[in-house]
Amino acid sequence: MERLLIVNADDFGLSKGQNYGIIEACRNGIVTSTTALVNGQAIDHAVQLSRDEPSLAIGMHFVLTMGKPLTAMPGLTRDGVLGKWIWQLAEEGALPLEEITQELASQYLRFIELFGRKPTHLDSHHHVHMFPQIFPIVAKFAAEEGIALRIDRQPLSNDGDLPANLRSSQGFSSAFYGEEISETLFLQVLDDSSHRGERSLEVMCHPAFVDNTIRQSAYCFPRLTELDVLTSASLKYAIAERGYLLGSYHDV
C-alpha cells in the first residue's frame, strides 16, 4: 500500500542558518515542505532562497510566542513583543481571541505579499494553534481559505467538530525531536503510523546549520544531527522500501 509522507521543516525565516539547513535538507535530502515565520528576522532571506528551490512546498508557521506581532496585540504582548506567557493566559482563560483572529489574518496576508502565493498549509510556532481556544479559529480560517492544516489529533477531543472541507494529513508526528535523533527513530515514526493504518503522515523536523540565533535556542545542536539524518541516502531508500511516497500538502 502506497502512503504519503510529508517531511515538514519548521522555522523557515528564523535565521540564515535555519534557512540554509532547510534548503540543504530539501535539495539533498527528504524534506518536501516547510513553514515560514513571517515575522522572523531572516524571512526575507528565506524568500530569496525559496526562489531557487521551486520543489519546496511552503506553508505558514503562525507565530504567537516570539518577536513582534503584525497587529496591535495589547492582550498578548509585553513591551510590544510576544512570548511564552501565552500558556499562562490560556490556563487562566484570558487569551485575547479577537486579537489572535486579526493577527492570523494579517500574518496570512503578509505571507502572500512575501511569497506571491497562498501557503500550502498552516501550522504554528510551539503548536499554539492546537490550544483548545485557538484551534477553532485556525481551523475555520484554513477551511475558508482552502488551505490545509497541521492537526495533532491526540489533543483533540472530537474529530467530528472539524469543518467538513478542512484538509489535513491523517497522521502527524513530532517525535523526530530531541537528543536521540537517528534514522532508527525516524523509521520508527513511520512504522507506528503504518500500524495505525494512516494513509498520509506529516513528520515535523528542524534541520539547521548552527548560527548565533540558533545558539540561543534551547534546541540547538540536535538541529545539525537532524540535518545529517534527513540527508542520508540510506534513510531515503528505507522510506521508499516501506511504501511511502514523498510529497506535500498539495497532495492531501
UniProtKB/Swiss-Prot annotation:
Pathway(s) of this molecule: Glycan degradation; chitin degradation
InterPro entries linked: COD_ChbG_bac, Glyco_hydro/deAcase_b/a-brl, YdjC-like
One Gene Ontology CC term in the entry: cytoplasm
Binding, Mg(2+): 61, 125
Gene Ontology biological process terms, A to Z: chitin catabolic process; diacetylchitobiose catabolic process; polysaccharide catabolic process
Principal localisation: cytoplasm
Gene3D superfamilies per UniProt: Glycoside hydrolase/deacetylase (3.20.20.370)
GO MF entry, a single one: deacetylase activity
The protein's Enzyme Commission number: 3.5.1.105
UniProt entry tagged with the keyword Magnesium: yes
Catalysed reaction, written as an equation: N,N'-diacetylchitobiose + H2O = N-acetyl-beta-D-glucosaminyl-(1->4)-D-glucosamine + acetate; diacetylchitobiose-6'-phosphate + H2O = N'-monoacetylchitobiose-6'-phosphate + acetate
Pfam families: YdjC
Class of enzymatic activity (EC top level): hydrolase
Metal-binding is among the record's keywords: yes
Cofactors demanded by this protein: Mg(2+)
Compartment(s) of residence: Cytoplasm
Annotated keywords: Carbohydrate metabolism, Chitin degradation, Cytoplasm, Hydrolase, Magnesium, Metal-binding, Polysaccharide degradation
Family, similarity comment: Belongs to the YdjC deacetylase family. ChbG subfamily.
Annotated HAMAP family: COD (MF_01246)
Subunit (UniProt): Homodimer.
Known role: Involved in the degradation of chitin. ChbG is essential for growth on the acetylated chitooligosaccharides chitobiose and chitotriose but is dispensable for growth on cellobiose and chitosan dimer, the deacetylated form of chitobiose. Deacetylation of chitobiose-6-P and chitotriose-6-P is necessary for both the activation of the chb promoter by the regulatory protein ChbR and the hydrolysis of phosphorylated beta-glucosides by the phospho-beta-glucosidase ChbF.
Full protein name: Chitooligosaccharide deacetylase
Source species: Escherichia coli O1:K1 / APEC
